[in-house]
Amino acid sequence: MSKIVKIIGREIIDSRGNPTVEAEVHLEGGFVGMAAAPSGASTGSREALELRDGDKSRFLGKGVTKAVAAVNGPIAQALIGKDAKDQAGIDKIMIDLDGTENKSKFGANAILAVSLANAKAAAAAKGMPLYEHIAELNGTPGKYSMPVPMMNIINGGEHADNNVDIQEFMIQPVGAKTVKEAIRMGSEVFHHLAKVLKAKGMNTAVGDEGGYAPNLGSNAEALAVIAEAVKAAGYELGKDITLAMDCAASEFYKDGKYVLAGEGNKAFTSEEFTHFLEELTKQYPIVSIEDGLDESDWDGFAYQTKFWRQNPAGCDDLFVTNTKILKEGIEKGIANSILIKFNQIGSLTETLAAIKMAKDAGYTAVISHRSGETEDATIADLAVGTAAGQIKTGSMSRSDRVAKYNQLIRIEEALGEKAPYNGRKEIKGQA
């Protein structure tokens, strides 16, 4: 009852008003899976290719009709009649048929949409939730945990039209007992942050990921106003809630220097910028820093990893959910945490392989959204089904972000004590 009988691809709209690929996979017995590919703003140069049409007369060149045609044409022809339960086999057929290193023939957006839709259809055919099916595909059946949210409540960099260099300032409700409580804590801090910003005469418009995007006097001021909001919400910073940042440093890396417009265009070397960030960690309980250097700055990352020792030095643009690059990073002692993004690699099977490699090496794996999202909440199921421990899916506004939090609430309700929320224990160096 899990044989594929029909595949449909279509062009839909993401949270930034740009087109993306949605796919449906239909099986015998009437089972259907549907999924959509997300899209990033600050992207690593070695990510799998997101295929765009380039026709400037339509969606300013960002249409995805070529990728949709690949879904409805060669991909559908190759997969009809195949067993959807064989996820690795389905993904291999698409990857081999594409035949390129970075999925540039069909587009990672086409392959990923079908890959995820196939997993959803197979789960439906097996009569189980997606997270349970993912746990089985991961080789860890019945082993679940609820992830600690990393809530991006101040947006900067490529995610906002403001003067803040660092792209994400996040809170982690590590003191919560359940993910539902963690989400409530995050919501309360988010609303108190609005009051803090308004009292200072600052803008409370939001960025791509639902966090506030005010103009600030410095990057450190973002941490200061968050600390004020945490206190106003009745929580203790460092105990109930810790902080995290995504620098997206590749976006302000110019001619071998890190140039911060928000710090008066001050330029830093790799070591100087590492120490700049270190000073922030001395002032605030920042327990995770992502993309603290440019993706090409391997020597700088090695220094940063050794310098910080216990705290997670996460890599997103550098590793791009790619096991070949991650393996090299592990061998060279680069970072100790990886961001997991489906569309950076382009299939569920390859995503699961990256999570396994990271965990086997003692790295933490943070399941992450992209700045261009849809209502698709698959990453919530991925985080629970792989017991990843942490999830990044934006702030407490915009339905494209909240959809993932709501799915986590539903999953926790269904699993109960089978999926513990481990809070601080999930954060490297904080257990």
Swiss-Prot record:
One of its GO terms (biological process) is glycolytic process. Binds a second Mg(2+) ion via substrate during catalysis. It is an enzyme of class 4 (lyase). Mg(2+) binds at residues 246, 290, 316. One of its GO terms (molecular function) is magnesium ion binding. CDD domains: enolase. InterPro entries: Enolase, Enolase-like_C_sf, Enolase-like_N, Enolase_C, Enolase_CS, Enolase_N. It catalyses: (2R)-2-phosphoglycerate = phosphoenolpyruvate + H2O. Catalyzes the reversible conversion of 2-phosphoglycerate (2-PG) into phosphoenolpyruvate (PEP). It is essential for the degradation of carbohydrates via glycolysis. Belongs to the enolase family. This is Enolase. It comes from Shigella flexneri serotype 5b (strain 8401). The lineage of its organism: Bacteria, Pseudomonadati, Pseudomonadota, Gammaproteobacteria, Enterobacterales. The gene is eno.
